[in-house]
């Protein structure tokens, strides 16, 4: 299977892949990243999934995007022949968003709002949530 992105042609490996979720953003040490990617390559890992659940890392404050942390992971994976699935970070909203819009919280059956700090604590059907989510999806 191939796809064209810009002026580059990307060919995907045929057949099943062995992949893992990789959260380098929790321990952002360049030496660890290099070691982890080498170990994954040696173990036959062909794909990593990154980026989800860290909206606060993508957008540390309202409208300010900081995506430079992704570059070493993407470059390192490419150097090791590991494909990347870049997840969207929208199932764990940043604290600034929950403070700015407390109405986005899911309301439990008992009538209380789900507090910030877990995952999936927002109302995904909210138009306002979807506007913020789309904004982070399109960040560059």
Question: Language model features by range: what are they?
Answer:
Residues 5-32:
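Boundary/entry segment of secreted carbohydrate-active catalytic domains
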Residues 7, 33-109:
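Aromatic-lined substrate-binding rim segments of carbohydrate-active enzymes
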Residues 10-14, 47-51, 112-117:
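Short amphipathic alpha-helical segments, especially helix-boundary/capping motifs
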Residues 18-28, 53-70, 115-135:
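The substrate-binding groove and active-site-proximal loops of carbohydrate-active enzymes
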Residues 26-42, 133-139:
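Short, acidic/polar
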Residues 92-140:
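Active-site-adjacent "subsite" loops/lids of carbohydrate-active enzymes
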